[in-house]
Amino acid sequence: VRPAPADGGMAAEQMADAIRSADQSAGVLRLYGNYGGDILNFDMAGDLVEFDEITCTTVLLTDDVASAPPEEHEKRRGVAGMVYAFKTAGAAAEEGRDLDAVTAIAQKTADSCRSIGVALSPCTVPQAGKPTFEIAGDEIEMGMGIHGEPGLWRGKLRTADEIATARMERLLTDMPLSGGD
């Protein structure tokens, strides 16, 4: 749990406080999605905790296939892949692995993840007091980002089978799978 500024955003000092709280003299893995504000604030937080002699590593999630083509993978947003990276990194840390090993496992997980979102309705961030985007009740948007960033397409609601097929086609086209995977 981390406190947020009044505008709903995160500040570097709050992230530095979270890093300090998490540190148990073994270093801290910063694991987050590829969003400009998060990168800026986590980088600044890392600089701040260097004064406390806290070692930090970073794994940046870029799993959202809707946000950039494969050849621009580094521009992709981080979305659902974070859940898996959190789980594998947490399990490795719980086993007592060192920071480098935990980071390597989280990075391998991040590199193996692909995701694509589907939006049916917006959420309302309490601090903002308004929906993050607008969409009609009979519409769907494939690939919308978690902050309401535009997706690949918006259209009339489709069946669950049609949506699943469209998502799987996009994911499987993007994933470097081979026999036995």
Give the role of each language-model region.
Residues V1-S25, T165, L172-D174:
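Glycine-rich oxoanion-binding loops at beta->alpha junctions
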Residues M10, D23-Q24, G37-F42, E53-T103, ...:
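Active-site histidine-anchored catalytic micro-motif
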Residues S67, A93-D181:
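Mixed-charge interfacial surface used for oligomerization/domain docking
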Residues P5-G8, Y32-Y35, K75-V79, W153-D161:
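Hydrophobic alpha-helical scaffolding
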Residues D23-R30, D181:
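Short, surface-exposed connector motifs at secondary-structure boundaries
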Residues G46-D52:
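Short, surface-exposed basic-aromatic patches at helix termini and helix-loop junctions that form
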Residues P3-A4, V28, C56-T57:
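Hydrophobic anchor at the start of a short beta-strand
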